[in-house]
Amino acid sequence: MLKHQIKITINAIKKIKKLLLKKKNFKLKLRIFITGGGCSGFQYGFELEKITKKNDISIIQSGIEIIIDPISIQYLLGGKIDYIENLEGSKFVISNPNAKRTCGCGLSFSI
C-alpha cells in the first residue's frame, strides 16, 4: 500500500541498483530518513544499510528495497523520490507535498 503513497522514479531505481552493484551487495537497502537541521529546519538523509529495524517501513519496487523509520514516513507520504544529474551535480531529490518551504539548494524543508 505504501508504494502507491511514495513514488520512486525509474532514475532513482537505476541509481540505487548502480550503488548496490558498486558495493557488490544486492542485499543492501536504501534508508531514507529525516533529521533536524539545514536552513529550513529539517533535512533528508540517505544511507545504504544491511539491517531493517523492527518498526521500519519497507518499500520494495523493481528489485530494490527502501526502508523508512515510522517518524520519517509521516513526513514523506505522497512524495516522490527521484535522482537527477545536472550542471549542479547529481543527487537524490524528494518532491514532498508536506513541505511548506524548502531552501534554495533543496536539501532542507519546513513543515
UniProtKB/Swiss-Prot annotation:
Iron-sulfur cluster binds at C39, C103, C105. Transmembrane segments: none annotated. Binds 1 iron-sulfur cluster per subunit. Pfam families: Fe-S_biosyn. SUPFAM superfamilies: HesB-like domain. GO terms for biological process: iron-sulfur cluster assembly. Keywords: Iron, Iron-sulfur, Metal-binding. One of its GO terms (molecular function) is 2 iron, 2 sulfur cluster binding. Belongs to the HesB/IscA family. Homodimer. This is Iron-sulfur cluster insertion protein ErpA. It comes from Buchnera aphidicola subsp. Cinara cedri (strain Cc).
